[in-house]
Amino acid sequence: MTENSELNNKISTIKLKKLIEIQNLTDNMNGTVIRIRGFIESITSCSSQIFILLRDRLEKVQCIIFKSTNVSSIYEFSRLKKLPLESFIEIEGQVVFAEIPIKRATKQNIEIVISTLNILGPVVSKLPFQLKDCKIAGKESDTNTITVGYNLRLDNRFLDFRLPVTQSIIKIIDQTMYTFRTYLRTHEFIEIKTSKIIQSGSEGGANLFSLNYFNKPAYLAQSPQLYKQLAIIGGLKRVYEIGHVYRAEVSNINRYLSEFVGLDIEMEMETTYIDFIHFLHSLFINIFESFKNEMKKELEIIRQYYEFVDLKYRSTPIIITYKDAVDMLKSKNIQIDYGCDFSREHERILGKIIKDKEDIDIFTIIDYPSSIRAFYSYIDETTKLTRSYDFIVRGEEILSGAQRENRYDYLKNAVIDKGLNPENLKNYLEAFKYGAPPHIGCGIGLERFLKAYFGFDDIRYFSLFPRDPNRIFP
């Protein structure tokens, strides 16, 4: 029999009281006997007492074992002092007022006097790293503080999930998807799920993951673009998707993921593309406000690890044209020709220009030339520019979209002009022969959006199990 098994047998059996989560403990529960569970974050002791800081989700409460109680014998008391950190335990005890506020706990005014204790999940091996040693790169701190490398944290992601900052980021991710979904459902959008195994790419280019599909070549979808459009042509009017997207980008791993979550929107075009930009801006305002109103605790925890600056925005969008943006860059002596796409550095400089001028961190660039947009972008017959738009947050593109070309002949010619083979897009093109409504849409990279929102330098913080050219596990 193992030492932990012996300890479990000797410690009193827990009665089946209703389990209470630490987050639901309140000051007015003084004197109540409760049952709670959590991970042991720390243990300190003196000759007659053991103090256990118990953690569950984002909450922490101090629990006390008195040597004089019947929790354990003298021998067992000494062993309880040595319980491994991160052991998952269940305790029963009485809630009492703390004489002095317990600063290291989130429940600072109460503590639990333990009467029974059970080790539900023992730690049987040395931890890969100590959670107290983790911090996000960029946080100013004592240079003597040990920092756990992020790759080590990712290798042991299950343990990294226990960090309050990681859980806070995960809750922010969840809140983003929830608000995105709620906003669109309120506006009568239908959620769809498109295939991720495709016959050919929607964007052209070589950034595709190939696979063997029953002895036939296939690829992982780099966008749900074509399927979204087919849904609109099919009369669904307004659709959205939250789903994985795959890009075989061999580039800066801090900015790109090989697998990321796309937030995609497509709808019949009812007014103008400028009106759709206002609709999207309102969506982002809803997300930003939901962070401020519903994620206060999570934002504060993240600040303890990374001191980000609050995003500045207005209720109405700031919109500049592609030409305006190029002129702004030229005014700063940046070498760029009209017709060139913006680099990451160009976006960063434009973000600074707009911030200095408007004191705003989010703006929209519209009317790109067709040479740097996808084949399905609608070209205005007067301006000869696409009715397109990119949203920039803190100098980083987080959304790209356009009105779509819905006329078959124009669309087929655009495919050819881009050097693509119409045969590879035959099923897609065929749909436009049978009455395709004018439509419009966009795609948002969830992880990149949140990276830009917080101003972090590594996109991997916003993916549960990030995939990049150097990582395919866990």
Swiss-Prot record:
One of its GO terms (cellular component) is cytosol. Residues 225-228 are annotated as: Aspartate. The keyword ATP-binding applies. It holds the Pfam family tRNA-synt_2. It is an enzyme of class 6 (ligase). InterPro entries: Aa-tRNA-synt_II, aa-tRNA-synth_II, aa-tRNA-synth_II/BPL/LPL, Asp-tRNA_synthase_2, Asp/Asn-tRNA-synth_IIb, NA-bd_OB-fold. Keywords: Aminoacyl-tRNA synthetase, ATP-binding, Cytoplasm, Ligase, Nucleotide-binding, Protein biosynthesis. The keyword Metal-binding does not apply. Its main location: cytoplasm. L-aspartate binds at residues 203, 247, 400, 404. One of its GO terms (molecular function) is RNA binding. GO terms for biological process: aspartyl-tRNA aminoacylation. SUPFAM superfamilies: Class II aaRS and biotin synthetases, Nucleic acid-binding proteins. It is found in: Cytoplasm. This is Probable aspartate--tRNA ligase, cytoplasmic. It comes from Enterocytozoon bieneusi (strain H348) (Microsporidian parasite).
